[in-house]
């Protein structure tokens, strides 16, 4: 039997397969990241731009526009158990401790830019507080089980100083390895950590998966990449033309050679001739002045119109309003409703993505609950755990208030409903505080009413004691209808 410091044969086979798969996918992932970060340098075709000017780089941030506006709309709110209207306290504590919203934002950014993101749920120093972290797809390779829609094995490789570390996660065990970075050296097994989970505690967030490509696809599509390349080359042509043709060219006809000679007999430079000599040319011996012709300077709109054409194509591909690309200042919406209509398709995409990512986040919550309760089953109702997202549409407080007020007036919804406060844009913490304030305010109102009743007790006839001066002879007052 092999010692625990040596990889078993089946473990080594899995490790080598995943390591090869990661290396094979790394180039495509790095290219997608370069488009997202605006670091991709477009290849010069060397048709109109000489090789000596290839050092001029033109960069467009349109790749980032395929990612960031969509991540901004994916705002996680809370987990709720089936039948409950409030967030679960246990899961809320775990998520707050781990900064889950920040980790989820990074995983979603990876999913949109690289096609997939990963969230790992592990253990830390506190056995009842799981660790939830986002892992980069460029460091991760996965063997996926299509039937169970879950990973069989997951390998994560990362650098630590001069050495390279690797973590191989398998059902019931986690293997930690290291490599000294020397060519030809072997991977060393540092630790073998058994656990009680019969699954790999890694969740994949795949953007726009297909039945034949479940690993997801980048939101920076091939069509968008072609548009970015064409627009970048056009901008490069604009840069070169600005340097060569922005100064109007001039032609001098009938000038004498002496017009280009300095008083000391040396020749004037081309720059001196352009700036000075042509302004003070003398007549020749026949009294004729040299004829100066100025060529028409280049028009930059030749290039900017092409860039605008590419921008219009990118706008359609991205489902973004044209002004998002910084080209159409006249494209600003005239009203809030107009802005909502312009971004409607992007909002519908966000709704679809929420439906896609909800089962994945439910798996994250299940893993967190299992690790926080070692040896125990999931709580009742956890299988139907709900994931609450904030609405992706642009929020208009005035419009929302008007709509809710009309619904409350029609008694379609109760005014103190938590749903009403959520539609008005209040966060869970704010809604809880408002509920506490409402209870305190109602208590104050009841106390104030009780104090008023104590100070002014009502008699059986409906008047205050000692205050009914018209109660009749028995009350010491005047009878009804009597004169004063």
Go through the PLM ranges and name each one.
Residues 1-134, 139, 450, 461-465, ...:
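Extended, helix-rich architectural segments
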Residues 11-12, 124, 253-275, 364-398, ...:
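Charge-rich, acidic-biased intrinsically disordered regions
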Residues 80-84, 282-400, 436-438:
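Surface-exposed loop-to-helix/strand elements on domain peripheries
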Residues 113, 118-225:
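Extended, regular secondary-structure scaffolds
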Residues 117, 233, 237-248, 316-327, ...:
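Intrinsically disordered or highly flexible coil/loop and linker segments, enriched in small
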Residues 191-341, 388:
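Extended, charged amphipathic alpha-helical segments
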Residues 403-410, 414-431, 437:
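Membrane-proximal bilayer-interacting regions
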Residues 424-457:
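Long, highly charged low-complexity segments enriched in Glu/Asp and Lys/Arg with interspersed Ser/Thr
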